């Protein structure tokens, strides 16, 4: 094809787009580039043909030369093209040709400077497939590539700007090979044709060609900007070469105006946004795009996401043990999972378990095993399970072997719950707010897609679904698995997305509910242990085995607990192996005695241990017991106290019928102080024993001083104080010392001794007060008249019944209590006849019989041994004290105080008080030895079955 076609086409196109505006002043030297070209024409004439080409050193440019080519070769090609154009257009003279060549070189120099200042692009490359396709079409059609440019100037998608060969990177030319030289030759021919056909307006024509090529090449430059930006920076692209000085020298007004207007005065040609050319945010992070993608990092990240979110879609089933754990499949052992499918992960609907068993740090989303809430039990350093330590009271059912695992603590469960929520916001910047994985829509980077055609599909930011979105429903539907970001464009269906979102929401809620239920269940179990401990302490359980009861209870409930008992306080520590922490609780209460409520607490404990009653129901039952009222109101207890005082006086202290009546009246006074006044005033309760002993001693000596009244001072005083004697306190202390609970036993025993001294001091003070008032007060401590011993068969059962009722026993418990008490007293009576003045031995024999009967009742009839044995023990204490008459030893000291014989007062008072304390200790030691011996006799080999409480 001739070049005239191209020129005509150019002319038409110029007139079409308004280029004739530039023809009005074609030769004005106002343009800075034209003036510089005219000034340099003389120097170029002297240089000769060898200086037709401007080297890169003159332009302060690096030597960008294609491999295999040089400047001389390019100059020879230029001269060849010029010669061919002269031959084609013979009317032109040689001078015109020379001037045309010089003008052509000046135009090219000015164009290069303008491009260097404004464009910064070396060469716009399309993808290999598109170039091959374009050149194949050109070869098939037989057209010259130089002829295509003017003909397709209106089509902006196929036009590219091919800059001077000297500014083309070397590696680019090496890759393109022959295609590059074809484009170069076509460009040269096009320029030579334009020079040969123009005279005075040739410069403006070349500028029009240049502007058209720049404007049409800009869309392709924007398309491949991400891929070529790193190359232009690393190879010294033209944008990096211009500085402040170069911009002032080379840039003209027209070039700056054109650069600001986006590449020309024809708005129809430019269809790109000029503001995005220097968008630093879009160009940021493009330095290492030519490096290969590290697939190992992607695999590691995928594995982490698999482990964190694998079981989110797994099926869970509620546990059967204590309602706290679920179940799941562990078919795949560790190391069996891989990044298998097209997306690189397994399916979310397949139960993936990175570990065979749940670990401490596992969340409930990724673990549904039955042992998800369990941790290994802590090896506590106690001697409860020491095989060398023989526990003589190891009765049936009270021993529970240590468990291998326990439930995790509250803190560990809360951390699992929070970790469960945090995992949805951490891994790989994925959003799990709506239980679906979506990636932020961003323009697709075309740099890494050399094997794909960019085509005509341009990113549309207003499209609803971008190609970079990855939705979990599409991945699940295609079976590509674990909801990782997929590089393939998928368009999920709304129905499937909503379905998966609902399923994931249900599974997330189920996981949180399971953790919440576990925490609630754990708190219920810990609360049950605390309430059980308080109830046992408050209602009079055997204190020497209280720690063991708590340990066995915690083992049954799978709670990691440690217990330390001191009188009046239980220190409880709940451990958490998950976080290596512990929670310490203190249970403090005054020890009391309530046989019926103690029986109810024991019943609840037994049902919980044998899995008959749930922990929630047990807590409600214990709360009902703790908040429930006593069986008998205080005024009934006062009458019962007086009744018991009158019943104990004949058979224990040798009183007659009159002394029984007097003891009843004084007992009413003492009972009122204990059950009414002491319950309303905490301050008075601290001095109750001393004040009660003072009142009893004062009233008893006053009544006994009445002439011819036959009132025995000693019988009435001891009978009235029999129910407040520290027999039970000393008994518990001796049992604790016998079971090697040294801390509690020593403290309780010392308190019992001081308590006895309080009573002795009160008796002495009351007798001395009445002696100061009445100088003829009686000094006799023994009774002259006694009731027949056969009446004791009536008094002892009545006293036992009264003791049971005062201690809030139900009437159904009274027959067993009365029987055991009568049997114990028979042994005490006949052994006292044979072993005179041997309190310890007599008490030991009686306690042995009482222990045998109580343990047989517990083993055969599955009864409650403690409630059956305690009234019988209380019967033994007054009998032992009465055998020594130590309680009235202070009366002699009172007489000495009244008679002002102070020389022996201190010694007598000390001996009297200490003798009473020693007598109480002797009785308690004999009782404790007898109880241990009876337990060993009933359970010779430590057989343990169902009996839970014993003395």
Curated annotation (Swiss-Prot):
Q: Where in the cell is it found?
A: Membrane
Compositional bias segments (type: Polar residues) = 1-10, 68-84, 92-104, 318-332, 354-366, 468-484
Stretches with biased composition (Acidic residues): 126-135
This protein is called: Pheromone-regulated membrane protein 10
- Please report the record's description of how this protein sits within the membrane: Multi-pass membrane protein
Where does this protein have compositionally biased stretches of type Basic and acidic residues? 219-234
State the family it belongs to: Belongs to the ThrE exporter (TC 2.A.79) family.
Q: Which UniProt keywords apply?
A: Membrane, Transmembrane, Transmembrane helix
InterPro entries tied to this protein:
ThrE-like_N, ThrE/Ser_Exporter, ThrE_2
Q: Tell me where the transmembrane regions lie.
A: 635-655, 657-677, 687-707, 711-731, 753-773, 786-806, 811-831, 841-861, 863-883, 918-938
Which organism encodes this protein? Kluyveromyces lactis (strain ATCC 8585 / CBS 2359 / DSM 70799 / NBRC 1267 / NRRL Y-1140 / WM37)
**GO molecular function terms attached to this record:** transmembrane transporter activity
Annotated region Disordered: the residues are 1-293, 313-366, 433-487
Q: Which Pfam families match?
A: ThrE, ThrE_2
Provide a GO CC annotation, any one.
membrane
């Amino acid at each position: 094809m001739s070049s005239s076609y191209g020129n005509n086409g150019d002319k038409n196109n110029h007139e079409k787009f308004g280029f004739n505006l530039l023809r009005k002043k074609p030769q004005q030297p106002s343009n800075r580039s034209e003036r510089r070209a005219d000034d340099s024409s003389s120097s170029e004439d002297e240089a000769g043909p060898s200086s037709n080409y401007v080297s890169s050193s003159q332009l302060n440019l690096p030597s960008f030369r294609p491999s295999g080519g040089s400047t001389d070769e390019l100059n020879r090609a230029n001269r060849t093209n010029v010669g061919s154009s002269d031959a084609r257009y013979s009317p032109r003279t040689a001078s015109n040709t020379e001037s045309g060549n010089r003008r052509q070189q000046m135009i090219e120099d000015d164009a290069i400077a303008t491009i260097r200042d404004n464009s910064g692009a070396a060469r716009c490359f399309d993808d290999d497939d598109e170039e091959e396709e374009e050149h194949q079409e050109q070869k098939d059609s037989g057209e010259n590539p130089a002829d295509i440019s003017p003909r397709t100037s209106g089509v902006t998608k196929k036009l590219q700007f091919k800059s001077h060969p000297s500014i083309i990177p070397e590696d680019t030319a090496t890759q393109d090979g022959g295609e590059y030289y074809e484009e170069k030759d076509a460009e040269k021919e096009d320029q030579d044709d334009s020079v040969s056909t123009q005279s005075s307006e040739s410069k403006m024509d070349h500028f029009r060609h240049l502007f058209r090529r720049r404007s049409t090449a800009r869309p392709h430059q924007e398309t491949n900007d991400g891929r070529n930006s790193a190359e232009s920076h690393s190879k010294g692209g033209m944008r990096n070469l211009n500085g402040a000085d170069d911009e002032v020298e080379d840039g003209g007004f027209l070039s700056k105006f054109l650069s600001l207007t986006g590449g020309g005065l024809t708005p129809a040609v430019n269809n790109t946004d000029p503001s995005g050319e220097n968008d630093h945010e879009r160009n940021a992070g493009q330095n290492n795009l030519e490096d290969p993608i590290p697939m190992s990092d992607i695999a590691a990240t995928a594995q982490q996401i698999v482990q964190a979110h694998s079981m989110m879609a797994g099926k869970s089933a509620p546990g059967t043990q204590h309602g706290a754990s679920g179940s799941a499949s562990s078919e795949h052992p560790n190391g069996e999972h891989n990044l298998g499918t097209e997306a690189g992960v397994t399916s979310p609907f397949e139960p993936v378990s990175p570990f065979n068993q749940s670990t401490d740090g596992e969340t409930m989303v990724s673990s549904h095993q039955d042992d998800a809430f369990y941790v290994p039990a802590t090896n506590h350093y106690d001697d409860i399970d020491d095989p060398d330590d023989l526990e003589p009271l190891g009765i049936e059912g009270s021993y529970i072997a240590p468990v291998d695992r326990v439930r995790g603590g509250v803190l560990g469960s809360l951390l699992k719950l929070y970790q469960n929520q945090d995992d949805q916001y951490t891994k790989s910047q994925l959003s799990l707010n709506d239980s679906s994985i979506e990636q932020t829509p961003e323009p697709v980077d075309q740099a890494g897609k050399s094997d794909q055609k960019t085509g005509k599909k341009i990113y549309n930011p207003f499209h609803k679904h971008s190609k970079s979105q990855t939705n979990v429903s599409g991945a699940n539907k295609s079976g590509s698995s674990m909801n990782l970001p997929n590089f393939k464009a998928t368009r999920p269906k709304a129905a499937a997305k909503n379905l998966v979102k609902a399923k994931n929401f249900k599974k997330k809620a189920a996981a949180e509910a399971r953790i919440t239920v576990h925490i609630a269940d754990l708190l219920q179990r810990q609360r049950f242990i605390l309430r059980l401990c308080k109830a046992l302490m408050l209602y009079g359980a055997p204190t020497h085995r209280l720690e063991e009861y708590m340990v066995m209870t915690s083992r049954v409930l799978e709670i990691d607990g440690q217990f330390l008992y001191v009188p009046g306080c239980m220190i409880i520590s709940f451990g958490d192996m998950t976080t290596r922490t512990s929670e310490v609780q203190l249970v403090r209460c005054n020890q009391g005695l309530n046989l019926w409520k103690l029986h109810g607490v024991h019943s609840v404990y037994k049902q919980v241990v044998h899995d008959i009653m749930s922990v929630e129901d047990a807590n409600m039952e214990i709360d009902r017991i703790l908040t429930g009222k006593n069986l008998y109101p205080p005024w009934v207890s006062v009458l019962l106290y007086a009744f018991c005082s009158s019943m104990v006086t004949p058979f224990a202290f040798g009183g007659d019928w009159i002394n029984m009546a007097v003891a009843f009246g004084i007992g009413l006074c003492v009972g009122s102080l204990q059950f009414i006044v002491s319950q309303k005033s905490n301050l008075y309760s601290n001095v109750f024993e001393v004040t009660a002993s003072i009142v009893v001693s004062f009233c008893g000596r006053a009544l006994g001083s009445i002439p011819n009244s036959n009132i025995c001072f000693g019988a009435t005083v001891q009978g009235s104080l029999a129910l407040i004697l520290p027999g039970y306190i000393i008994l518990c202390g001796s049992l604790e010392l016998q079971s090697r609970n040294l801390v509690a036993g020593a403290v309780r025993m010392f308190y019992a001794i001081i308590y006895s001294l309080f009573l002795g001091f009160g008796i002495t003070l009351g007798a001395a007060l009445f002696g100061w008032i009445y100088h003829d007060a009686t000094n006799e401590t023994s009774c002259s008249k006694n009731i027949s011993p056969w009446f004791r068969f009536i008094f002892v059962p009545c006293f036992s019944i009264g003791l049971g009722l005062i201690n809030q026993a139900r009437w159904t418990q009274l027959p067993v209590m009365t029987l055991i008490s009568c049997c114990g007293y028979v042994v005490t009576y006949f052994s006292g006849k044979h072993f005179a003045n041997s309190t310890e031995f007599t008490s030991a024999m009686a306690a042995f019989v009482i222990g045998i009967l109580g343990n047989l009742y517990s083993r055969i009839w599955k009864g409650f041994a403690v409630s059956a044995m305690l009234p019988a023990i209380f019967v033994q204490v007054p009998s032992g004290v009465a055998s020594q008459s130590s309680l009235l030893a202070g009366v002699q000291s009172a007489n000495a105080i009244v008679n002002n014989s102070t020389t022996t007062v201190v010694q007598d008072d000390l001996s009297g008080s200490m003798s009473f304390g020693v007598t109480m200790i002797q009785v308690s030691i004999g009782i404790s030895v007898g109880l241990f011996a009876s337990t060993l006799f009933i359970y010779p080999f430590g057989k343990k079955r169902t009996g839970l409480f014993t003395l």
